[in-house]
């Protein structure tokens, strides 16, 4: 066993399951940073996390910091002593800070002068002495939104702490962390194994905890076991488990000794829309639903117990009894809701505020209805179906099912609309109006759904910006960033012919006199263009490419995307760097000139062969490229413009732009402005690095 292995384990009460991984990873990152900053050499840093513990193991940790030579330069000699040769206050203060007197200081002489100098050999501190503060500091920096206090102490942490284990090899490092003295005591599983035992050496972790405490401390090992066992359990009943990553992570964080079991529920409940049943199983009970090979929900579920029972059937029966009333509630709500039409819920929307200054959900529904119809007309969707879907868009929020199972909003609207005999694209739109809900989520599948989804999001953006409540910092209570990116994704990926300018103006117009921000249209568009920046950065585009396109402020998202792809391709051309530099040069020349330019380049004033050649090329390209620009063929246009490299280079090599003759000078500046205008039809490539 190595004497250089370090172990820290913080034994707590049950930690928040959704935060367990981030707490453990942050703890590891913080400790690693502390070790690196202190200059302590170390090997691999492993983290462990279970419901009642956070732990780290560091391999090959140096016994002490390396010794180092310290040099601190003091005041110049001229400022260090007065006319009588007595030390100045500045010199005395510097010396005091170094722990010496002025006469003990050395002198440093260079060709620039002479200074006081403190030089010392500093012995590195022992690792044992440094670790307690490092651990305390690392714990204090954990991302804990809400701390709690326990007992009579003033100690705060995410949950009460019961044990602190600090071992360097086989030695306990004396310390008090979070109010608990360090020891070699570790607590095992609450109901299995040894409830408490001592660990002799850091290298024994986590195996000793597994063998004596019946706790799998390795998070990834625990997660892999749950996944494999659940897949096998589902296979045995002829199905496939819905092992969504988020739920798998949460369940992994809830158990120390996972035991996967299979249970069932009554088949009659399968008459309820599967989304409601799944919401209950996954959201409330943390169960894994099971589907057949055709994707149909089976009357079974898989759950994970935290104990290896002598009578597992008793645990299975208990879980079946727990879930049955929830499924019965869903069945009752579903049957009750269908006794009236979805549209009958419209009046009740008047009782729910969307936002105090912006009115009720009924008001929002009217706006969505009108805006969805307008959008449908722009993109060639069925206007009647879009307005109908807009009218019904929020009605399911008033149903019993959605009131009880909030995550079923939208999907229950779809089921109830189908029951009422609404058109299929209307029903689908009620569900897909919220898409995309998150990064990478599917987009609305039909034009009517696209119209309603865009209308809902644009109404929120226009309204909230219209009353001056735009996102600040990381606070975004109305999820405006997600809404903006959702609109952009739908328009770009569905290639819809929509302009943010007219779209925003229409959304704002529907609010009437309710909005107080006179700049709301520009604010919304600027915000959405900012979302474009984030989106394309995530897609791997360079910041300068994005800035080059943003400089033109294109408000048609599909057009913006075409420009981005064109500039990105342009950068791969051999001529791109030279033309970008030339555009930058042209931009600077034009910016420094305050002379009024001509409307056209006058051929009669052209004198040099290089300027005549460039002017001729521009005339040909201008006429050729206008149809390209009109059709959004920006990539083809930039490929053609790349041919200007040679005449542009010749122009700058052979032509004096700022000629003494005013007419010649203005004509040459006009020529350069026409050159720049051609490139600006696509983007400001002078911004390319």
Swiss-Prot record:
Keyword check for Repressor: no
InterPro entries (UniProt xref): DALR_anticod-bd, Gly-tRNA-synth_bsu, Gly-tRNA-synth_heterodimer
Superkingdom of origin organism: Bacteria
Any GO BP annotation: arginyl-tRNA aminoacylation
Record organism: Klebsiella pneumoniae (strain 342)
Any one GO molecular-function label of the UniProt entry: arginine-tRNA ligase activity
Subcellular compartments: Cytoplasm
Subunit and partners: Tetramer of two alpha and two beta subunits.
The protein's name in its UniProt record: Glycine--tRNA ligase beta subunit
Cross-referenced SUPFAM superfamilies: HD-domain/PDEase-like (SSF109604)
Entry keyword set: Aminoacyl-tRNA synthetase, ATP-binding, Cytoplasm, Ligase, Nucleotide-binding, Protein biosynthesis
Enzyme Commission number(s): 6.1.1.14
Record GO cellular component, one term: cytosol
Subcellular location, principal: cytoplasm
Top-tier EC class: ligase
Similarity-based family: Belongs to the class-II aminoacyl-tRNA synthetase family.
């Amino acid at each position: 066993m190595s004497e250089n292995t370090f172990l820290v384990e913080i034994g707590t009460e049950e930690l928040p399951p959704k935060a367990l991984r981030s707490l453990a990873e942050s703890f590891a990152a913080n400790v690693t940073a502390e070790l690196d900053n202190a200059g302590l050499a170390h090997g691999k840093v492993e983290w462990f996390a279970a419901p009642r513990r956070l732990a780290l193991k560091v391999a090959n940790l140096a016994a002490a910091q390396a010794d180092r030579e310290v040099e601190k330069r003091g005041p110049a000699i001229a400022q260090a002593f007065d006319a009588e040769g007595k030390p100045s206050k500045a010199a005395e203060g510097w010396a005091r800070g170094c722990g010496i007197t002025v006469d003990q200081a050395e002198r440093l002489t260079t060709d620039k002068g002479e200074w006081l100098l403190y030089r010392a050999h500093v012995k590195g501190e022992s690792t044992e002495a440094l670790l307690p503060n490092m651990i305390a500091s690392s714990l204090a920096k954990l991302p804990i939104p809400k701390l709690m206090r326990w007992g009579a102490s003033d100690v705060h942490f995410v949950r009460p702490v019961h044990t602190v284990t600090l071992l360097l090899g086989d030695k306990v490092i004396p310390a008090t962390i979070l109010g608990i003295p360090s020891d070699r005591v570790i607590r095992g599983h609450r109901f299995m194994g040894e409830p408490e035992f001592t660990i002799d050496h850091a290298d024994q972790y986590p195996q000793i905890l597994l063998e004596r405490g019946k706790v799998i401390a390795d998070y990834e090992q625990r997660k892999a076991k749950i996944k494999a066992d659940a897949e096998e359990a589902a296979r045995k009943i002829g199905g496939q488990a819905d092992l969504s990553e988020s739920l798998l992570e949460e369940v992994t964080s809830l158990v120390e000794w996972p035991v996967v079991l299979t249970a069932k529920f009554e088949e009659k409940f399968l008459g309820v829309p599967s989304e409601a049943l799944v919401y209950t199983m996954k959201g409330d009970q943390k169960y894994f639903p099971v589907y057949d090979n055709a994707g149909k929900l089976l009357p079974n579920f898989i759950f994970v117990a935290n104990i290896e029972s002598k009578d597992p059937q008793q645990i299975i029966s208990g879980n079946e009894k727990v879930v049955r009333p929830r499924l019965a509630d869903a069945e009752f709500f579903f049957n009750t809701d269908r006794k009236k039409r979805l549209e009958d819920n419209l009046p009740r929307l008047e009782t729910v505020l969307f936002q105090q200054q912006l009115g009720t959900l009924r008001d929002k529904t009217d706006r969505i209805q009108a805006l969805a119809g307008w959008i449908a007309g722009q993109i060639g969707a069925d206007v009647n179906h879009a307005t109908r879907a807009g009218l019904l868009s929020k009605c399911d929020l008033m149903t019993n099912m959605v009131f009880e199972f909030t995550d079923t909003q939208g999907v229950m609207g779809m089921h109830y609309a189908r029951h009422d005999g609404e058109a299929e694209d209307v029903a689908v739109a009620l569900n897909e109006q919220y898409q995309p809900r998150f990064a990478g989520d599917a987009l609305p599948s039909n034009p009517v759904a696209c119209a309603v989804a865009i209308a809902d999001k644009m109404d929120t953006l226009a309204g909230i910006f219209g009353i001056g409540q735009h996102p600040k910092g990381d606070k975004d209570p109305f999820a405006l960033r997600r809404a903006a990116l959702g609109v952009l994704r739908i328009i770009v990926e569905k290639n819809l012919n929509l302009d943010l300018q007219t779209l925003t103006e229409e959304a704002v117009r529907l609010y009437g006199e309710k909005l107080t921000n006179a700049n709301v249209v520009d604010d919304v568009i600027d915000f959405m263009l900012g979302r474009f920046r984030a989106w394309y950065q995530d897609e791997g585009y360079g910041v300068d490419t994005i800035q080059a396109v943003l400089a033109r402020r294109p408000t048609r998202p599909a057009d913006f995307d075409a420009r981005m792809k064109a500039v990105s391709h342009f950068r791969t051309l051999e001529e791109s760097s030279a033309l970008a530099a030339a555009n930058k040069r042209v931009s600077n020349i034009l910016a420094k000139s305050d002379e009024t330019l001509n409307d056209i380049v006058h051929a009669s004033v052209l004198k040099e062969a290089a300027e005549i050649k460039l002017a001729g090329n521009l005339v040909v390209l201008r006429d050729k490229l206008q149809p390209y620009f009109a059709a959004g063929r920006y990539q083809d246009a930039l490929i053609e413009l790349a041919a200007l490299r040679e005449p542009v280079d010749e122009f700058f090599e052979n032509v004096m732009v700022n000629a003494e003759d005013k007419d010649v000078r203005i004509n040459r500046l006009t020529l350069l402005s026409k050159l720049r205008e051609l490139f600006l039809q696509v983007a400001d490539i002078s911004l390319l690095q």
